[in-house]
Structure formats: structure tokens, C-alpha cells
């Protein structure tokens, strides 16, 4: 019975690592820090306990947030007047303020983020 949560924990850990790769692509410093944080949290809760299912669920939620809600911006460090460029990938959740009022439904975006 104890082997089933271990498989789920491993699956959750892999999902977190995949999500960090997507969210922090081309930002090695942040990518390594996020992966180190994930590893430390999983190591801290290595033994199966009463709260293991909650910890696994938390890891899956973190992976979802990283994958769907984190957008990184970058600009030329030498030019203070340079515009920020956002790296919006295919899995980013898009919508406008009116879409917040539509609970539980997918929002179809029919326009690009930058006009």
C-alpha cells in the first residue's frame, strides 16, 4: 500500500520539474533555483505520513500555476528605456478582466496579446 503514494509523489515531482522547465526556459539561474527548491521540499517530506496526499496535491497545484500563470519578462539591461518583452508560451492562461466573472468555463481568446 505504501508504494502507491511513492509513485504519485514521483509523478508530482516530475510534473513540477517539467513545469519549471516551461516557465523558466532560457533563465538558467531561476530554473536551477526553482528546481533546487522543489527538491528540498520533496526531500523534507520524503517519508510517507498523514499529510502526504496533501503535499502531493500541493505539488500538483504548484506545477499547474507554474505552467499556466507564470510569465517572464526581459529587457536589455544596458538600456533603461527599453521595453519589457514577455515570454508568453502556448500553455499560458489568457483572458481579459471580463473573463474572471465567468466561473468554471474556458475562455476563448480571439485576439493576440499584443496589438
From Swiss-Prot:
Xref: Pfam families: Complex1_LYR (PF05347)
GO aspect biological process, one term: mitochondrial respiratory chain complex III assembly
Annotated Gene Ontology cellular component terms: mitochondrial matrix
Keywords from the named record: Chaperone, Mitochondrion, Transit peptide
Subcellular location field: Mitochondrion matrix
Major localisation: mitochondrion
Annotated InterPro entries: Complex1_LYR_dom (IPR008011), Complex1_LYR_LYRM7 (IPR045298), MZM1/LYRM7 (IPR050435)
GO molecular function, one term: protein folding chaperone
Domain of life: Eukaryota
Description of how the protein assembles with itself and partners: Interacts with RIP1.
Homology family: Belongs to the complex I LYR family. MZM1 subfamily.
Role of this protein: Assembly factor required for Rieske Fe-S protein RIP1 incorporation into the cytochrome b-c1 (CIII) complex. Functions as a chaperone, binding to this subunit within the mitochondrial matrix and stabilizing it prior to its translocation and insertion into the late CIII dimeric intermediate within the mitochondrial inner membrane. Modulates the mitochondrial matrix zinc pool.
Protein name in the entry: Mitochondrial zinc maintenance protein 1, mitochondrial
Amino acid at each position: 500500500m505504501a508504494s502507491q503514494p511513492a509513485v504519485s509523489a514521483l509523478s508530482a515531482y516530475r510534473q513540477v520539474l517539467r513545469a519549471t522547465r516551461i516557465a523558466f526556459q532560457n533563465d538558467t539561474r531561476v530554473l536551477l533555483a526553482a528546481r533546487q527548491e522543489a527538491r528540498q521540499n520533496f526531500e523534507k517530506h520524503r517519508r510517507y505520513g498523514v499529510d502526504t496526499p496533501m503535499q502531493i496535491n500541493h505539488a500538483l497545484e504548484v506545477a499547474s500555476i507554474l505552467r499556466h500563470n507564470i510569465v517572464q519578462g526581459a529587457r536589455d539591461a544596458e538600456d533603461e528605456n527599453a521595453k519589457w518583452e514577455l515570454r508568453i508560451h502556448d500553455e499560458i492562461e489568457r483572458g481579459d478582466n471580463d473573463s474572471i466573472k465567468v466561473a468554471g468555463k474556458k475562455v476563448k481568446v480571439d485576439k493576440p496579446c499584443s496589438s
